[in-house]
Amino acid sequence: MAELRSNMITQGIDRAPHRSLLRAAGVKEEDFGKPFIAVCNSYIDIVPGHVHLQEFGKIVKEAIREAGGVPFEFNTIGVDDGIAMGHIGMRYSLPSREIIADSVETVVSAHWFDGMVCIPNCDKITPGMLMAAMRINIPTIFVSGGPMAAGRTSDGRKISLSSVFEGVGAYQAGKIGESDLQELEQFGCPTCGSCSGMFTANSMNCLSEALGLALPGNGTILATSPERREFVRKSAAQLMETIKKDIKPRDIVTEKAIDNAFALDMALGGSTNTVLHTLALANEAGVEYSLERINEVAERVPHLSKLAPASDVFIEDLHEAGGVSAALNELAKKEGALHLDALTVTGRTLGETIAGHEVKDYDVIHPLDNPFTEKGGLAVLFGNLAPDGAIIKTGGVQDGITRHEGPAVVFDSQDAALEGIINRKVKEGDVVIIRYEGPKGGPGMPEMLAPTSQIVGMGLGPKVALITDGRFSGASRGLSIGHVSPEAAEGGPLAFVENGDHVIVDIEKRILDVQVPEEEWEKRKAEWKGFEPKVKTGYLARYSKLVTSANTGGIMKI
């Protein structure tokens, strides 16, 4: 084991004041010289994915003490994307990732901890902590709060939060009654935990396993299961072994590990937000990773599992089918799909970790010889509308749809788009453009779950494409293309599209184009008056000045 970092605040005559303060915080004489462990929690009452994490913090601290460490718990902030959806609150969601990363870095660096247990769960909390772990680079393990169970309607049908969002659109279109919508609302979110489909939170918690920063089960063991509590205890104990081996996050998160994470993402059809967060993570880890490389992973990794919202199969079903380890083990049978020699938090390789984890239900995790598609469930599109790339969750697109072209219907905000969709300004065959909603323009790159849910609920899901420099909830599905870079607020091509322009989306060829004569296009660019920031005070004003487009991970640069 390397020399303890905490010696900086515990050893020597001149550290007597430091020890005095530590004694006041409950540290005993025999604790000096033991590893000091940061227990980075994210308990918060208003977020259902986090309401139970106070208990998990206690389990972690108990396990750390039993293993010979001294735990110190602190908390980060958290935003519930579902509650923040569809109003100004969503502007704070992605920016909260940076606050979380900065706050974790601040607490851990100021107090010279020797190791860290991160207890995240929901959308921006997991990536925020991952980014911080890369910056600090001390032995760290991730243990998420776990997913909630799927809801069930009175007729036994499984549902999730996305069912409720889409239910609003269905109700407004006259497809269901008020009592049907009330039932969806009542039963859509039945327990604590991260929402029950392959949405952003669960995608990132599953990817933490593939990255090697979490033990098997992190992404799929239900929040309410006794198995989850035992998993939390086991993970905390593992950290103490990781400290002895001096394995740090940057030893684990290499180019190979990021390939493995995206391979899992492709196999499970994860949220498009994983691209945004993993690119930000790579930046913090000092790993250069391009969008083109993501397409290369998609070319060699098949789509093996179609989970909610793209189907009625939920995270609990994935767990029963063998979980992430079984999915990875199935992928490992294809040469070149994974880097099996990648290091994990235990000191074992990924190959050693997943060995023996067989698929228990091939209806949930398809075999290699019968994938949903030969290419992975995410794709990066390029073209004159997205010179620096755009993202589509191909795993959420209806089977058989690989191309869409039609006239643009342009909106300068999500609110305007939602109003236009509700008022039937969007019809079959259209391409909805929602711009000035990127990291800088939003600001905060808000999610477009309300418009996509409205489109699906009205029965237009397979018949309308939606393109935006904003992003999508993991609960979104259909022809939803987001993360268009550069964004409109930076003078990206979306800023120059007009109603009626012919737009082409070709998933197979990875193309996103608009057909406008070059002379006309240059005229529009010359006439563009620039972007006036929507927020001029507070954190969002500072954020919008420093944030970059989605192709960089939406990171902040000075």
From Swiss-Prot:
Pathway: Amino-acid biosynthesis; L-isoleucine biosynthesis; L-isoleucine from 2-oxobutanoate: step 3/4; Amino-acid biosynthesis; L-valine biosynthesis; L-valine from pyruvate: step 3/4
Listed EC numbers: 4.2.1.9
Residue numbers carrying N6-carboxylysine: K124
Lipid biosynthesis is among the record's keywords: no
A Pfam family hit: ILV_EDD_C
Family label: Belongs to the IlvD/Edd family.
Name of the protein in question: Dihydroxy-acid dehydratase
Source organism per UniProt: Bacillus velezensis (strain DSM 23117 / BGSC 10A6 / LMG 26770 / FZB42) (Bacillus amyloliquefaciens subsp. plantarum)
